[in-house]
Amino acid sequence: MTFKYEEVTPSAAEFCELRVAAGLSAKSLKAAQIALPNSLYAISIRKEGSLIAMGRVVGDGACNFEVVDVAVDPNYQGMGLGKRVMEYIDMYLSSVALEGSYISMIADEPAFYEKLGYRLVSPSCQGMTKKFNPCN
């Protein structure tokens, strides 16, 4: 199988579709249209023009980086594409992260990321979240 690797964000519609297909939480098209251009880095994998895997890095570009939106179409899971997405992300991070930079993620599949060298921070730290009502 031939895959095309593009270091660009997908379209907002593709992004929203792949998130849902891969089992991630749904995002509105409006949110995606605002968020994607603010990515520090993105990798998209395509087969015959269709988006089948993706991942992004967001943050301030120096002190904090967050790995987000790592998703693989269920029809292509188990082929190493998630690992390839993370290899591209890790190459980017290794080229820009400074001493003391903090790289984080909310890992839906911690065992997958641990195989790639990422470590759980608990019990020394705990992830937290807070939901806000839509502003529109």
Where are these regions (language model features)?
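Short amphipathic alpha-helix that is part of the acyltransferase structural core
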Residues: 1-30, 124
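A conserved beta-strand-loop-helix scaffold within acyl/acetyltransferase catalytic domains
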Residues: 31-71
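A generic "binding-loop/recognition-motif" signal
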Residues: 63, 108-111
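Conserved acetyl-CoA pyrophosphate-binding loop and the N-cap/start of the following alpha-helix
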Residues: 76, 80-88
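Conserved GNAT acetyl-CoA-binding A-motif
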Residues: 86, 93-107
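Conserved catalytic-core motifs of GNAT/GCN5-like acyltransferases
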Residues: 100-104, 119-136
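Conserved active-site tyrosine of GNAT-family acetyltransferases
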Residues: 113, 118
